[in-house]
């Protein structure tokens, strides 16, 4: 059981107004360098108005899908892979980042200094530059 397990048995949440809906918006996990106006703008992109009220654009039930361990499958992923973590990520500790990268035949680990879990929100320029540099070094 996880905190989203009840989502599987109930319908997509509905809210009367966009403002009420946005008051519920939170990053999961918490932690970001994005300011309040940036978070609000991000939230606005994640909601939609339907005939019965305001709801999230994503399928609520997707949070409840079970998944197994990926560790045994890593050696079979034979593509170049850049695994990125924010320095302050609450989800992907540095040892796990290194373990994932080491488990991939062509994996490389990269940590973006100062970023939380949502690296693309916290350090978009640094992330884009790192991905571009990584891609430039790949064989054609």
Cite the ranges covered by each PLM segment.
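Catalytic histidine-centered segment of alpha/beta-hydrolase-like enzymes
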Residues: 112-128
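Residue-level signal for the nucleotide or nucleotide-sugar donor/cofactor binding architecture
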Residues: 16, 92, 122
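Hydrophobic "lid"/C-terminal helical patch
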Residues: 25, 127, 131, 135
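Acidic/histidine metal-binding catalytic segments
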Residues: 31-45
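An amphipathic alpha-helix signature
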Residues: 18-26
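Conserved serine/cysteine hydrolase catalytic core
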Residues: 47-103, 108-111
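Glycosyltransferase donor-binding loop in the core domain
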Residues: 13, 89, 116-119
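Flexible "cap/lid" loop of the alpha/beta hydrolase fold
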Residues: 1-18
């Amino acid at each position: 059981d996880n905190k989203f397990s009840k989502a599987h048995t109930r319908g997509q949440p509905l809210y009367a107004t966009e403002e009420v809906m946005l008051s519920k918006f939170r990053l999961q996990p918490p932690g970001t360098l994005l300011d309040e106006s940036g978070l609000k703008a991000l939230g606005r992109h994640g909601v939609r108005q339907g005939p019965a009220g305001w709801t999230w654009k994503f399928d609520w039930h997707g949070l409840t899908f079970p998944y197994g361990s990926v560790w045994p499958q890593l050696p079979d992923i034979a593509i170049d892979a850049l695994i990125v973590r924010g320095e302050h990520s609450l989800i992907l500790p540095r040892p796990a980042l290194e373990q994932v990268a080491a488990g991939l035949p062509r994996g490389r680990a990269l940590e973006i200094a100062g970023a939380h879990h949502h690296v693309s929100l916290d350090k978009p320029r640094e992330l884009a530059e790192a991905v571009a540099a990584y891609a430039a070094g790949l064989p054609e």
